[in-house]
Amino acid sequence: MKSVAQTVIEADRFYTIAAHTGNVIQAVEGSKDGGTVRLGKYDHKPEQEWSFVREGDGVYRIRNRASGKLLDLTMTGTANGTWLHLWEDVGGTSQMWKVEHTPEGTVRLRSSWAGGKCVDTVGIGAEVGAVLQIWQEVPGGGDQLWVISEVKDRIKRAAKVEQAAPAAETKAAPAK
């Protein structure tokens, strides 16, 4: 994976979390507890954007913008292959993630609950539709490296849409 600029995580901001393919972590069924989390092509949707709620030194709860639900471990699992899903904030350690920066500017997301296992993809795939799981660290494992990027263009895009919309025509009132 090539080097990328390191993103500083700040409160009250939203971010995408992208695999080496550019596909991002997204909530597929984000409005319900147990909602699926998969990779998808970034379409500027709130289901694909996340905030990081600081819990301690490099430890965060990762909250989905659309639903407010947290990235969590299915059944509070700790084994390799435990899937990730969304769940309401229950204050549990299975919802806490250590953000570990690499020299290349990527990060590993490590479960605070599952002995530091890394967010990974099922089947070593980072294509659209890949399901997320935890797995022990695999040296050189590109599927465990993520790029966190701040979402900056949402306001700019909205302003462009407003500017592009034709102004309403004003007609003079008919003479009486």
Where are these predicted regions, by residue range?
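Lectin-like carbohydrate-binding module/patch detector with strong preference for beta-trefoil
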Residues: 1-176
